[in-house]
Amino acid sequence: MFGVTENTLWVESFRPGTLDGYIGNEHVIQKVKIFIENGDIPHLLFYGTAGTGKTTLAKIIANSVDADLMYINASDENSVDAVRDKIKRYASTVGFKRWKIVILDEADYLTPNAQAALRNLMETYSRTTRFILTCNYVEKIIDPIQSRCQTFGITPPDKSVVAQRLVDVLNEKQVEYDVNDIVAIINSSYPDIRRAINSAQSHVVK
């Protein structure tokens, strides 16, 4: 592949900002659209393979409603104190929008005690705060949290759909490529869309 290298990560530059730009999982998207149209977002739990768009979908939802947003990556902040203190401080303050949304990314990294604290926070602040959790392994999320969420499995799009998204990115970045390049990247990365785009960017040379 030949193009111009840059510091900006393509996965961020081309992260969909709306539901219309999101690929795959049409049945989930239709339900999410109803939540947004009604202006009433439940607690949500998205689970599935890494790189298939769980975090992207969570951020689209948060940005599509009248809400303040707090984002926490639970792989970095997974202790009971981090969850309880940070979220409680955020949820208990007066907001200027209808909702407060907490995205807990990689929630399966939360310790059992942290999950127990989270369950209590979900109950205490349910009038004003909605929680959107993402994880790879839903079985690591305690049942009391799962029961408080609308839970959706996020499945990877077909290889052809991922390949077309990669082609769109390369065309937008004016990168010359061979079809064999696309096939090789998809075969080594699928079903991880994020990995495919990162791999393509890493192969671009000056």
Model-flagged regions — what are they?
Residues M1-F152, S160-N171, V179-N187, R195-S202:
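P-loop/Walker A NTP-binding region and its immediately flanking N-terminal helices
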